[in-house]
């Protein structure tokens, strides 16, 4: 499954905002320009299209100026948490339960945007499976396959992923 299965291609690529030039993620800039990212990827992530990302980041930087140029909000969980692109190209996550947003409250996922898309595609598949078989993770082999797949996307990702599908 590739990202185009979750996000349709735009008929005409868009120009992206100049603020993104400071962020080391050509794949995110390309996806923002060529894919319609304005949709829920899976239950815990909705990515923003270019217009929504600009609005979200203007607000973020107005409220938290220390984040300007260091973090770019790419999406949200719908629960008050959100996904960020850090200046070095890593994807990070902010948990609203931690209180006021500060750089110390932002968790580095240590994955690239391409890995985040791979994670999104896989989790969308898992959520479709769970829609038809809510006991899917009752099978130990399925739980292990889930953990193994996340760890193939990025070493140690299963342990870093904030939402639990089973415990």
Model-derived regions: residue spans:
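A short, terminal or domain-edge coil/loop segment
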Residues: 73, 90-97, 127-135
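Compact, glycine/acidic-enriched structural inserts
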Residues: 94-128
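A surface-exposed partner-binding patch
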Residues: 1-87, 133-137, 147-167
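Secondary-structure transition/turn motif
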Residues: 87-89, 94-100, 143-144, 148-152
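Short, low-complexity segments with poor structural confidence in diverse proteins
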Residues: 139-141
């Amino acid at each position: 499954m590739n990202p185009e299965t979750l996000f349709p291609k735009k008929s005409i690529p868009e120009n992206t905002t100049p603020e993104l030039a400071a962020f080391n993620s050509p794949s995110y800039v390309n996806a923002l320009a060529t894919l319609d990212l304005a949709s829920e990827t899976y239950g815990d992530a909705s990515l923003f299209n270019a217009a929504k990302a600009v609005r979200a980041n203007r607000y973020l930087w107005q409220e938290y100026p220390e984040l300007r140029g260091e973090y770019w909000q790419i999406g949200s969980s719908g629960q008050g948490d959100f996904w960020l692109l850090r200046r070095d190209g890593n994807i990070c996550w902010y948990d609203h339960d931690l209180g006021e947003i500060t750089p110390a409250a932002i968790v580095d996922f240590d994955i690239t945007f391409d890995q985040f898309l791979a994670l999104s595609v896989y989790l969308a598949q898992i959520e479709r499976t769970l829609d038809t078989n809510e006991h899917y993770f009752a099978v130990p082999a399925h739980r292990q396959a889930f953990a193994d797949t996340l760890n193939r996307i990025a070493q140690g990702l299963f342990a870093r992923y904030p939402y639990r599908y089973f415990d």
